[in-house]
Amino acid sequence: MAIVKCKPTSPGRRHVVKVVNPELHKGKPYAPLLEKLSKSGGRNNNGRITTRHIGGGHKQHYRLVDFKRNKDGIPAVVERLEYDPNRSANIALVLYKDGERRYILAPKGLKAGDQIQSGVDAAIKAGNTLPMRNIPVGSTVHNVEMKPGKGGQLARSAGAYVQIVARDGSYVTLRLRSGEMRKVLADCRATLGEVGNAEHMLRVLGKAGASRWRGIRPTVRGTAMNPVDHPHGGGEGRNFGKHPVTPWGVQTKGKKTRSNKRTDKFIVRRRSKK
């Protein structure tokens, strides 16, 4: 995998930094594992904007990725690595011995021809999925379940991983990248290793149009608006003279947003401040 800085042949190319992976498949994706993906433009079923700064962008198909990894005891061979426009990580197309193909998240170091397996008896190596009670303490894992059988929810983006730091009875304690320490049932599954494509964070889009290709619209500062549009709007100069708030007057920048008290008991230590 290489980091390529483009030559300044035009203003739009001057700052572009690309991540080039020659191992990625250059053809079309595997059609039976594709689904139609409609654009919402950030609107809900009433046509109201529920998420700002979304709209346009290139058409995409959704890749049906197997986050459950529940095909136990059947070895699979990695056929190829592919780009997935719906996530920062790359995905791998695997062929199981019984003839079924599935997409999985491509962990670091996985390449075409490698063999992977799921289940209690799987070997301790990157790409294999086991219940966390069978994974040694200190291991780094990704695609971690929070409820047994629900499928992986933690550590799924490029370069992400979670470390198993303790095992106590029916629970394991995980250290997340944010610094949070959290308890999860030991029967929950996780995939060994960390997610590949960690260089994704080094890319530079280089121009506004590259964001538009991805369906991201401009974000206008509140202080650049009029008073009718935003609490920070209007006035002489750039000072808005109050605590930062959202367009609807709710405090931002540091305000706590977590409201799921039911699972507070599973958080051993809160995430560390940056």
From Swiss-Prot:
<keyword id="KW-0694">RNA-binding</keyword>
<feature type="region of interest" description="Disordered">
    <location>
        <begin position="221"/>
        <end position="274"/>
    </location>
</feature>
<comment type="function">
    <text>One of the primary rRNA binding proteins. Required for association of the 30S and 50S subunits to form the 70S ribosome, for tRNA binding and peptide bond formation. It has been suggested to have peptidyltransferase activity; this is somewhat controversial. Makes several contacts with the 16S rRNA in the 70S ribosome.</text>
</comment>
<dbReference type="GO" id="GO:0016740">
    <property type="term" value="F:transferase activity"/>
</dbReference>
<dbReference type="InterPro" id="IPR022666">
    <property type="entry name" value="Ribosomal_uL2_RNA-bd_dom"/>
</dbReference>
<dbReference type="GO" id="GO:0002181">
    <property type="term" value="P:cytoplasmic translation"/>
</dbReference>
<dbReference type="InterPro" id="IPR002171">
    <property type="entry name" value="Ribosomal_uL2"/>
</dbReference>
<keyword id="KW-0689">Ribosomal protein</keyword>
<protein>
    <recommendedName>
        <fullName>Large ribosomal subunit protein uL2</fullName>
    </recommendedName>
</protein>
<dbReference type="GO" id="GO:0015934">
    <property type="term" value="C:large ribosomal subunit"/>
</dbReference>
<dbReference type="Pfam" id="PF00181">
    <property type="entry name" value="Ribosomal_L2"/>
</dbReference>
<comment type="subunit">
    <text>Part of the 50S ribosomal subunit. Forms a bridge to the 30S subunit in the 70S ribosome.</text>
</comment>
<dbReference type="InterPro" id="IPR014726">
    <property type="entry name" value="Ribosomal_uL2_dom3"/>
</dbReference>
<comment type="similarity">
    <text>Belongs to the universal ribosomal protein uL2 family.</text>
</comment>
<dbReference type="InterPro" id="IPR022671">
    <property type="entry name" value="Ribosomal_uL2_CS"/>
</dbReference>
<dbReference type="GO" id="GO:0003735">
    <property type="term" value="F:structural constituent of ribosome"/>
</dbReference>
<keyword id="KW-0699">rRNA-binding</keyword>
<dbReference type="InterPro" id="IPR005880">
    <property type="entry name" value="Ribosomal_uL2_bac/org-type"/>
</dbReference>
<keyword id="KW-0687">Ribonucleoprotein</keyword>
<dbReference type="GO" id="GO:0019843">
    <property type="term" value="F:rRNA binding"/>
</dbReference>
<dbReference type="InterPro" id="IPR012340">
    <property type="entry name" value="NA-bd_OB-fold"/>
</dbReference>
<dbReference type="Pfam" id="PF03947">
    <property type="entry name" value="Ribosomal_L2_C"/>
</dbReference>
<dbReference type="InterPro" id="IPR014722">
    <property type="entry name" value="Rib_uL2_dom2"/>
</dbReference>
<dbReference type="InterPro" id="IPR022669">
    <property type="entry name" value="Ribosomal_uL2_C"/>
</dbReference>
<dbReference type="InterPro" id="IPR008991">
    <property type="entry name" value="Translation_prot_SH3-like_sf"/>
</dbReference>
